[in-house]
């Protein structure tokens, strides 16, 4: 699915060049490159690498400090926990009842290049961390993936199970592009 243009917005472009307020106004605009965004039920979780990566807490706190009210790390962590059902770790950083199972690739299953990288990181003084989404510090760790029994679990698979698909107030329309979201007075989305 990842390479199939039917499952992507093929004309999206983005600049990855850093720009700042003191950029030369006569400089040419930054180059644009293709921006991969899924156009399939389940979104990026249906086509990307099954990674279950959280951003660094300092990034969330910076967004809040720049005006994104409600985006502090402590505001977002409950939602990360609500989403996931961690199959490996049960602690204050992880959820146990969410719809998306997450697990880590055991070191015994790491390919040769990953083991070589781990050895190089170890020699460089980085420590092995059991979890990339736990206490945040520098180190190397097993990859956390949204996968169970060697099967991808996309948002569509996790949330749109057989019981949900039977709901009378749910219509799934693939091959359809949403142009507007309708919200009620409580700012809850009630239609498209």
Kindly give the residue locations of the regions a language model identified.
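N-terminal redox-cofactor-binding region of secreted/periplasmic oxidoreductases
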Residues: 1-192
